[in-house]
Amino acid sequence: CIPIDPFYLTYKARSVDYHTRLIELAGEINDYMPEYVTARLQDLLNDERKPLKGSKVILLGIAYKGDIDDIRQSPALKVWDQLEAKGADVTYFDPYCRSVKRNDKIYESCTLGEDLLKNADAVVVTCAHTKGVDYNLVLEASPLILDTKNVISKVTDVDLKSCPKLHLL
């Protein structure tokens, strides 16, 4: 796994006076991605004349990677924190993570339905689950989608050029 295992390699390499700068740079880029996702979403909302503050944002998938329930080291949680810090109203849907404890509070995965999606200002795909998510419904009902995993175009028949509400990272 990119975020963790290579740093062990870096640690061991240093013990024999070998430097792994490329791995360290990749780690820095990975660490910055939640900030980039937040800024990108803010720009997309601004294009729709909506501020991030007060916007209803659904995080689609909060697990560390697709089709698991492990949230440890999940970048989605960092995105969640940054969105909330900027005043967004954040909810999440994850078919594998039905509830999560964060900051001494229990959060429940919402039910992914047409009304929820239509009433959101944006959906951010932060995990590429292949089961348990109706991506066609997400595509049809959401007003704005930021797909950080490029999963929607892989599992639907969407033509990216003719779908202005779908944005890839």
Where are these regions (language model features)?
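Structural/interface elements that position substrates and couple domains in central-metabolism enzymes
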Residues: 1-169
